[in-house]
Amino acid sequence: MEDSTINGSHPHEPHAGGFATRLNWLRAGVLGANDGIVSTAGLVVGVAAATTTTSAIFTAGIAGLSAGALSMAVGEYVSVSTQRDSERALLAKERRELAEVPDYELAELTDIYRAKGLSPDTARKVAEELTAHDAFTAHAEAELGLNPRALTNPWQAAFSSAIAFTLGALLPLLAILLPPVTARIPVTVAAVLLALALTGSISARLGGSDPVRAVLRVVLGGALAMLVTYGIGQLADVAGI
């Protein structure tokens, strides 16, 4: 069995491209949940400021949740489908060039490894061995930065975005509906700001940035959204709309 550490002290770290892909998916999920929290919170707080009717608040919240989740899913599907089409076109071009001009492609791969600091002889040997093992994958990864067997699935991206948005949107919706009428808005604001602080901290840690600044940005943004919609709801209530 291989030791899990190098020299008994340094644990192996995940270097595979799949790890970075999983991090990107997790970060996108956090951002999707954040969108659901902010947009739904703004909507239900605005409606609750205009009326205390539970059915009206519930209907507005469910409508906003559904529209937001579908919008996220459609947008993500279109975006990822376009990206995948472009990646497939690049991969098809690379496969064609490997069949038509293999010597040129080998020289190109050699140059890539020379640019990374390998000596000409070593770069040539690496290029030849990788080409002999799996020429298409070697060239796709080195030249295009793509793994032909791990292209993003647009349906998976759409479903993940919709689920993340829905989970985020459920928090302010439940927070506005469950408490007594007089406590609805304060409880919702508190729950939303705490949730935004959590998502801001998680996204900052995933991205390696300062969590304090990230939390402040997202919390202030969410507070501003709720303040604006609360003001609009109050104006609608006063005007009798």
Named regions from a protein language model:
Residues 2-25, 80-162:
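Cytosol/matrix-facing amphipathic helices and coiled-coil assembly/linker segments
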Residues 217-230:
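Small-residue-rich segments of transmembrane alpha-helices in multi-pass membrane proteins
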Residues 230-241:
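Juxtamembrane boundary at the C-terminal end of a transmembrane helix
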Residues 35, 74, 123-127, 165, ...:
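Residue-level signature of catalytic and energy-coupling elements of molecular machines
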Residues 190, 194-209:
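Transmembrane alpha-helical segments of integral membrane proteins
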Residues 22-44, 148-174:
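Transmembrane alpha-helical segments and their cytosolic interface motifs
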Residues 2-79:
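Internal alpha-helical transmembrane segments
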Residues 29, 57-62, 158-162, 186-190, ...:
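Hydrophobic alpha-helical transmembrane segments
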